[in-house]
Amino acid sequence: MKEIIYTPNAPAPVGPYSQATRANGFVLTAGQLGIDPATSKLVGSDIAAQTRQALSNIRAIVGAAGRTADDIVKVTIYVTHLSLFHEVNAAYAAFFADQGVSAPPARAIAEVAALPLGALVEIEAIAAI
């Protein structure tokens, strides 16, 4: 059985999907852009700021499911320019360190041709229950 997870502390879905689904011992988030949930706008034109906001959105969604950043076991990151990997990596490392996570989760990163709203990064996560 699945349960839909929703929080107003992350951007509302812009299509026919949920912020996250809890099923079979996991919370699986939808891809998150660097959108500020208060304004529904991208937070900036740089990938570091968008990465921080996307991760903040994931933290809010995982939190709505009663989990923390330490429960995240897998992250997938999509970027429009793999040349910006180091900026994403720095923001990612800082996020998990700020959350008190000593061993960040497994991760994959892939370059894509484009993302919605002209975003530079999209991040999805899986957390264990």
What label would you give each PLM region?
Residues 1-56, 60-74, 79-129:
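N-terminal presequence-like segments and the immediate start of the first folded domain
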